[in-house]
Amino acid sequence: FLNIDYRSLKKTAPYLIFFSIIILIATKIVFLAKGFSWSKPARWLYLGPFSLQTSDIARFSVLIFMSYYVEKKAEKLKNFRNGLLPALLILFSIMGLIVIQPDFSTAFMIGIIGIMILFIGGANFSQLSLVGSFSLLVGIPILMSRDYRRQRILSYFGFSNMEDVGYQ
């Protein structure tokens, strides 16, 4: 990656996001087509002798796309409807596709990366704070909806048996 001119990545940013959405959807569809249940983790896309962890490609794509978007729409970023909302819709779409894999930690990290780029790029802090608050209101019940996830979260914060559920 040291030899890649980062300025040339701007041209590919929209295509990278589109490609990421396609492969994230394809990953889940392939696992469902193979007869696995909806809740079975579907994080790898196997293409013959090759395998891809599609969320890693999505992470790279979000980083490139958000940087591209901030540069392209810098003057509109303070406006929620015309500047911030389109970027958030793309970000949350990618995050949602990763959550259904299910891979909550990667979705969370991608969200943090995207929000930080938007903030550094000049997005309104109060608007980002409202979006973050709303995301927590939606995200916490989803995270706590399954017993094993709730136990892992509680063990992470030291509220559970560390030798059992929290051991990795």
Report the location of each language-model feature:
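Membrane-helix boundary/helix-loop-helix interface segments in multi-pass membrane proteins
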Residues: 1-101, 163
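Short helix-terminus and kink motifs of transmembrane alpha helices
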Residues: 7, 68, 106, 127, ...
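Alpha-helical scaffold segments in soluble metabolic enzymes
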Residues: 65, 69, 114, 152-155
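Residue-level signal for short amphipathic helical patches enriched in basic/charged
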Residues: 4, 99, 107, 148, ...
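Hydrophobic alpha-helical segments of polytopic membrane proteins
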Residues: 14-20, 81-99, 104-144, 155-156
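Hydrophobic membrane-targeting signal helices
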Residues: 5, 25-26, 119, 139, ...
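Short, highly charged low-complexity linear segments
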Residues: 31, 54-60, 121-129, 152-153
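Hydrophobic, glycine- and aromatic-enriched re-entrant/interface helices and adjoining loop segments
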Residues: 36-44, 129-168
